[in-house]
């Protein structure tokens, strides 16, 4: 993939890191209704590595020193559920990389777990394409990368669905 240097965004403690109020309210309602504490997973706590994925940083070692690793605890917690619904931003980067890590671990541990994963394609969007301002040529097509990833996740056995799709609770 093309590595882009991003401006600071979604930094811990700033408004960009906060959940949209409606999503936070839904999480709290779910916690109360199910009598189960919501788990908020933090990522990107090491300043020398990108952490697109919530499961694993881009760089795990710097000069032989471990700066991050795959989050096995969180993976196991996710897989204890009957279904894992995935939504968020952006489908071309953080969500995509998280699902790639999830799929890789599922394939290594128990390929049948792939059937638990439901990707809400209408609850995410890609970073806009990078376009040459002089020629109008698309330099990096992030929307295409996101769509290609969704297609590959579907081919691997994950469910790519819409939030408006009927949920079969008997399955």
Q: What are these model-predicted stretches?
A:
Residues 1-171:
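Active-site-adjacent betaalpha module
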């Amino acid at each position: 993939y093309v590595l882009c240097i991003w401006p600071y965004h979604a930094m811990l403690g700033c408004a960009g890191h906060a959940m949209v109020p409606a999503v936070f309210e839904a999480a709290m309602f779910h916690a109360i209704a199910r009598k189960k504490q919501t788990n908020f997973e933090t990522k990107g706590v090491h300043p020398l590595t990108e952490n697109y994925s919530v499961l694993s940083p881009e760089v795990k070692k710097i000069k032989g020193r471990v700066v991050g690793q795959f989050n096995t605890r969180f993976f196991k917690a996710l897989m204890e559920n009957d279904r894992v619904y995935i939504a968020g931003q952006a489908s071309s980067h953080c969500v995509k990389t998280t699902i790639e890590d999830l799929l890789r671990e599922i394939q290594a541990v128990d390929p049948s777990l792939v059937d638990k994963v439901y990707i809400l394609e209408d609850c995410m969007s890609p970073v806009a394409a990078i376009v040459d301002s002089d020629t109008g040529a698309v330099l990096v097509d992030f929307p295409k990368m996101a769509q290609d990833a969704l297609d590959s996740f579907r081919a691997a056995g994950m469910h790519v669905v819409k939030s408006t799709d009927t949920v079969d609770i008997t399955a």
